[in-house]
Amino acid sequence: MCASRYRAAQAALALPERFYSLLMTSPQVLDPTRPISDRPIDRLVAEFLAAEFDADPPGATVLGVPGYDERLPELSDPAVNARHVIDEKRLRAFEALPDDELTGQERIDRDLVISELRGRAMMRNWAAHRRDPAAYVAAGLNGVFTLFLHRLRPDAELAAAATHRLAEVPRVLAEARANLDPGLASPLLVRRALAQARAGVMYCREEVPRLVPHPEGRSALGAAAVAAADAYARFSDYLADFEQRASGEFAIGEQRYTALLKRKEGLAYGAGELRERGHAALADLTAQLRHRTMALAGHDDWRGYVAELDSDAPPTPEDMLAGYRTWTKRARSFAYDRGLVSEPPGDRCDVVPAEEFQRAVLAVAFYYGPPPFAAGPGPGHFFVPFPPAGATPAQIRERLATNARSTLATVSVHEAYPGHHWHLAWMAARTGRPVRKVLWSSYFVEGWALYVEEMMREQGFFAADPKAELRQVDMRQFRAARIVVDTSLHLGEMTVDDAVTFMSTQASLTPDVARSEVARYCAWPTQAASYLTGALEIARMRDEWLGAGRGTLRDFHDTIAGLGGLPIGLAEQALRSSG
């Protein structure tokens, strides 16, 4: 999962995905709030980005944009409605830009903003800010986390900024109480946010004061962290009561789902056809798993064999971390030495444990990219899913089994090389259009990471370890199951329990991980379907590129990844008009 420039705050863990902060005294590579030219589209883009950063200051911090580090977002109902009005006005302005007055690159920028604003418009009457507490809980936690992720400012300045943000936590949680409607809120999503709020109490009390190694600023930061922890504790009590009254639904329905696929992502099919594509892919990949299991184990009980492989898990979270570091290094060498992709300048990916507040809601590895607007290439961060504090021995064993030794190679490819880390580092180095460093589609970004898993298998990366190769197919099959479940949940064709059963019987997930996964699908409609859908679309574009003799495999990878993380339909248009 690319949680990253990266807009997961909109998911249930709410990992920010779009913005960031920069050391004010360092040389600024690019101020995205200033037009890159006097052309009308560049002025519109700069105004649009300034409004985006103003609406999501922690997102600005992630991206490396200076001037937003002391603030949290305004999430009151009037503020949300005011942004809706601004979005509609900007949508009309971008739609009014005619093709014949724009260059090819400008048309891509225009259409990228239009796709984003249309997606928001399609979900406006869903009133997510009245349904899901996650964004309110995540605002303060991610607000602090993003400040210290890349440490782009001196510790004393970061401590002061974090103190300001923590002081705003009670205000944000008060906005949640005013906005949340028990008739609209789903109990499942409330429970998910409650788990994060409780983790936030511990994060603020125990982790935040240790973020600053020097005494200067630590006292004020510690006091603000305790006050924020108290606010999260009170909000946890509120959510525990609110859950009992919540009676809303999480399913967005076929009309919204299809509109997002077609009008936002530029796909040619809607929710029903996507579900059937998922079923077909699931059947094909399950057959492959049976065949590979027969070759390795002499029987075709692939789920039983995968369970055996899961028993060969790292004995401790620290061993899991070491394994991910080893495979990340191997994947990097393979991708560069084989000439599959070009190396970005200053490339570095740090493999580190997940933060405590994230562990309660994410059981899988995830990634944050280097801030694209900061001075000089910084490291990306590949976060390893350590179990949360207080996890029972059984829960720790299950978390480790989900990260069995046979899975580490595929996950390292997906999250690091040449998956999320390489893509986002390459895009940051190659993309000169500011808006493409900010807006992206999960169908491309996650599609890319799954595409390269298969591409690396085709190139022989897993050949020396048939068990790891089987797990690559297993993890791809899991993404096919996601398509079936995500569409079925939001079309009202599956209950949550049905979905958990499906994922823990048709895919290889354990019941605990399956339940966590399904809760994520409920909170983030269409995202779970993006992985395999995007991967198949990118593979189709690759085959067309190579078939037309347009260049080498590396040329294709460098070209399409360098365009950004465009919606699939727009990526295809841009690829056809490139070079």
Predicted regions and their residues:
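N-terminal amphipathic/basic-hydrophobic helices that include classical n-h-c signal peptides
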Residues: 1-25
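N-terminal maturation segment of proteins
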Residues: 19-579
